[in-house]
Amino acid sequence: MQRAESELSTEDWRRVFQQAAKMGVLHLHLTGGEPLARKDLPELIRAGRDAGLYVNMITSGVGLTEDRLAMLVEAGLEHLQLSFQDLDEVSANHIAGTRAHAIKLALVPILKRYPLAFTINLVVHRLNLDHLEEFIALAEELQPDRLEIAHVQYYGWALKNRSLLMPTEEQVQRSLPIVDAAKERLKGKIHLEAVFPDYFGSFPKACVGGWGRQTMLIDPAGQALPCHSAAVIPGLQFDNVREHDLAWIWQSSSAFQRFRGDAWMSETCMTCPRKERDFGGCRCQAFMLTGDPDAIDPVCSYSPHHGLLKELRVSQPEALPIWRG
């Protein structure tokens, strides 16, 4: 978390968006943290649209009044993703750490009155995965354009709470036919996208579409990162948009070069027919699980550390949550 006084100014962001558009960037995703915390959010959205970018915002919805929503849409907001934590209000508020569930439900019909693409996000884990079928039914009533169901990714605070959040094998297996049936039932009405849990897989995901291939994250203070968790890897130097042009960072920054391409890969990955599909998997996950960012992602069945995941899949229901602060 950065102090507010260290954040980029409105004019800084305007310049960054213009540079991004010149590079061929198409999508601007405003996420957080919470984008609504920025008082200049309408100006940022307008700057993104003026640069020719498609503007999407991921939000908790807390603090989003209809008047403010109207301002954001008028400024050019095109897509809003609203995050939910569970079906039940008590459970959802407990997971969120705030009384937000009723606010989100009340916001949905307001969103539907505006010319705005609308996605519901649900992050699933051991505490809410058993409610998946009922949550999908709720989503059908709310009628978003998209429903994204993603298993929690074990980085940051989720990593600290992994023993609490890790679903059981039985929970995961029960969820698969529920998702498949919903995809078929909702075809042509709601696009359902589901992200399978890494720790239960045999092959890694193509994290952010490959390191330094299609995604650039700019944090509030202007640091440019190849992915959300890249700062966990020791030795990486992240250049700042206050000091360098965005195109230079993309093309020449040592952090973006570090795992771009395949020169860094082990022989196992280099000769694997899947390397153009998963690009070697997640470097942050490899580091957090093995201590070596160059290691084969342990999710991969070819990794000598793959057996570690079986041990980590053991859920500990008695574990207490670890909160910030």
Describe each region flagged by the PLM:
Residues 11-15, 64-67, 103, 241, ...:
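Short, conserved clusters of charged catalytic residues that mark active-site
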Residues 34, 63, 86, 153, ...:
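Flexible, active-site-proximal loop/turn residues at the rims of small-molecule/cofactor binding pockets
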Residues 231-325:
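Flexible mid-to-C-terminal extensions adjoining Fe-S/redox cofactors in radical SAM and related proteins
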Residues 26, 212, 268:
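Exposed loop/turn and edge beta-strand positions of beta-sandwich/beta-sheet ligand-binding modules
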Residues 1-79:
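Conserved alpha-helical substructure of the radical SAM core
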Residues 34-35, 63, 158, 214, ...:
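Gly/Ser/Thr-rich beta-alpha loop segments that engage phosphate groups in nucleotides
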Residues 33, 123-125, 287:
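Short strand-loop junctions, especially beta-strand C-caps/beta-turns
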Residues 3, 8, 54, 70, ...:
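Radical SAM enzyme [4Fe-4S]-AdoMet core and its adjacent flexible, acidic
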